[in-house]
């Protein structure tokens, strides 16, 4: 979309300001998430390892993606492949988030489906393999345009390799719509919705059976129900934040027109998702809220770190 290169509009100034604020909140919030998991041995379980992976992706969004998005919004003239690599980095961490969410959903499904065998199935080695696979897939999907699926035009004029860096100047929209969105965002979202539907179905059946069984079994599935609701909310917020921008990309691909302000709002909403998860954890997971408060108290009151030792309260894996 044409943008005046001689001056930065108020829309751009507002966009950049909000990007910076969102980035700072995302970094601080997700560093706290990792800190909480580190402080609480009861949270150092399979699910929370994947939550840490999600937090790392969100930190990367704040540290790398948002500054790069600002550079791209300004249309700075750089080499084609430098611009392309910047846009690819932005995609990598989006897919790292969706892969982490998928891993979390699969883990919760195994937790309620294979209650007895769960610990034997989710070994430390398999957890690390799953984490590695999540990030490997994210890098492969995000870097695909670097291997040829891009807007590069063959030309003998070397000057044409430098251009104002804009997302659509280097990134092909058929890649964004069919490969990135349909295949690697929409399909995993549908799969995760099906997984959570099955999780709630299993929990409901087990809870109904627990009335005639042990109280311990009922308590276990009650905790699993609360945990599943919290993680489903995280998934819902991801879909709510990312689908508008994906729909905008579809409109642009099919030659539709989208006002620059609407495009900025879509980008900001997608980036805002990176700062939402820490808030959800604090609101829905008691152990997170307690440790957030302990960390805040330690920072404000300058108390020694030993005062932040977590309580021995049990937490669902």
From Swiss-Prot:
Q: Where is the protein localized?
A: Cell membrane
Q: Which residues form a coiled coil?
A: none
Q: Name one GO molecular function term.
A: G protein-coupled adenosine receptor activity
Q: Its membrane topology, per UniProt?
A: Multi-pass membrane protein
Instruction: Quote the CDD domains the UniProt record gives.
Output: 7tmA_Adenosine_R_A3
Keyword Isomerase annotated? no
One GO cellular component term: plasma membrane
Q: Which residues lie on this side of the membrane: Cytoplasmic?
A: 38-48, 107-126, 198-230, 284-317
Q: Where is the lipid attached (S-palmitoyl cysteine)?
A: 302
User: What InterPro entries does UniProt report for this protein, alphabetically?
Assistant: Adeno_A3_rcpt, Adenosn_rcpt, GPCR_Rhodpsn, GPCR_Rhodpsn_7TM
**Extracellular face residues:** 1-14, 73-84, 149-176, 255-260
At the top level, the lineage of the source is: Eukaryota
Here the disulfide bonds are 83-165
**Keyword annotations for this protein?**
Cell membrane, Disulfide bond, G-protein coupled receptor, Glycoprotein, Lipoprotein, Membrane, Palmitate, Phosphoprotein, Receptor, Transducer, Transmembrane, Transmembrane helix
Gene3D superfamilies referenced in this protein's UniProt entry, alphabetically = Rhodopsin 7-helix transmembrane proteins (1.20.1070.10)
Q: In which tissues is it expressed?
A: Most abundant in lung, spleen and pineal gland. Moderate expression in brain, kidney and testis.
Post-translational modification note: Phosphorylation on Thr-315 and Ser-316 may be crucial for rapid desensitization. Phosphorylation on Thr-315 may be necessary for phosphorylation on Ser-316 to occur.
Q: What does this protein do?
A: Receptor for adenosine. The activity of this receptor is mediated by G proteins which inhibits adenylyl cyclase.
Query: Which family is annotated?
Result: Belongs to the G-protein coupled receptor 1 family.
PANTHER family per UniProt:
ADENOSINE RECEPTOR A3, OLFACTORY RECEPTOR AND ADENOSINE RECEPTOR
Q: What is this protein called?
A: Adenosine receptor A3
Taxonomically, what lineage is the organism? Eukaryota, Metazoa, Chordata, Craniata, Vertebrata
């Amino acid at each position: 979309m044409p943008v005046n290169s001689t001056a930065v509009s108020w829309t751009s100034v507002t966009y950049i300001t909000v990007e910076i604020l969102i980035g700072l909140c995302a970094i601080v919030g997700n560093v706290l998430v990792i800190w909480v998991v580190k402080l609480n041995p009861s949270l150092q379980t399979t699910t929370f390892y994947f939550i840490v992976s999600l937090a790392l992706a969100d930190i990367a969004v704040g540290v790398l993606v948002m500054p790069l998005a600002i550079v791209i919004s300004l249309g700075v003239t750089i080499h084609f492949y430098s611009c392309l690599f910047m846009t690819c980095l932005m995609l990598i961490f989006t897919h790292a988030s969706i892969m982490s969410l998928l891993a979390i959903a699969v883990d919760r499904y195994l937790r309620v489906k294979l209650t007895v065998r769960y610990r034997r199935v989710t070994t430390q080695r398999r957890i690390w393999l799953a984490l590695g696979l999540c990030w490997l897939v994210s890098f492969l999907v995000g870097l695909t345009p670097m291997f040829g699926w891009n807007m590069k035009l063959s030309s003998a004029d070397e000057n044409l390799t430098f251009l104002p860096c804009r997302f659509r100047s280097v990134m092909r929209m058929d890649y964004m719509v069919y490969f990135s969105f349909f295949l690697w965002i929409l399909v995993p979202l549908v799969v995760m919705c099906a997984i959570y539907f099955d999780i709630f179905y299993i929990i409901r059946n087990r809870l109904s059976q627990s009335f005639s069984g042990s109280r311990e079994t009922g308590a276990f599935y009650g905790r699993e129900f609360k945990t599943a609701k919290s993680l489903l909310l995280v998934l819902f917020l991801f879909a709510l934040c990312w689908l508008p921008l994906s729909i905008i990309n579809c409109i642009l691909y099919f030659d539709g027109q989208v006002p620059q302000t609407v495009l900025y709002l879509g980008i900001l909403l997608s980036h805002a998702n990176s700062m939402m998860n820490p808030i959800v954890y604090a609101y829905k997971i008691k152990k997170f809220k307690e440790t957030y408060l302990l960390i805040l108290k330690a920072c404000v009151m300058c108390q020694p770190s030993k005062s932040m030792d977590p309580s021995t309260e049990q937490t669902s894996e």
